Amino acid sequence: FKFLYGLDQSIQEMIFRWSKQNLIKDLEHVRDGENEYIDVRGKISNHELTEPINLIGLIDSKKGTIRANHYHPQQEQKCLFTEGQVIEIFQDILNLNAPKITQVVSKGQLSIIKPNVAHTMVFTKDTTFLNLVRGEREHDNYGITHTIKHVFVDEKEKNMLLSNYKFECR
């Protein structure tokens, strides 16, 4: 066995390539599909994924329910919404003074959640989305490796969001 490149050369090449990428630094952001193709049959909407994905979860959630209240220490999570609508609440857990931030994600949009960002979803409609991740997601490891519980939106706050959230001014 022979290495084709030295470690120094490989690291320099990685740094060069990564420094040329236009990275989004937001904790969590939402993107619409791009490069749409529309004809009489319907619409094709494209979402570019910037890293490999090895697991896709299909998640159905009922109107008025809450999911998440956790963070991922290492994984970036992508959620592609195929039906419904959700209020996402998120917070940077590495910054003790970080505020809670809300945003609305609707059908056809992709939500990208960075590592170490606590997030909760409050469903305003019956919703279906694809959960796209890289890494392991064994149910037995919940709370140990990939997903750490972090309750920061309770039932009272969920109900307040559902009854008072102003979608028109966003």
What label would you give each PLM region?
Residues 1-54, 68, 164-169:
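A short, N-terminal "cap"/entry segment at the start of jelly-roll beta-barrel domains
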Residues 57-74:
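Conserved short histidine dyad/triad with adjacent acidic residue
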Residues 66-68, 108-120, 137-138:
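Histidine-centered metal-chelating micro-motifs
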Residues 46, 88-90, 131:
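Short hydrophobic/aromatic-rich beta-strand segments that constitute the beta-sheet cores
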Residues 74-93:
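Glycine- and acidic-residue-biased ligand/ion/polar-headgroup-sensing regions
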Residues 93-115:
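Short acidic-glycine-tyrosine-enriched beta hairpin
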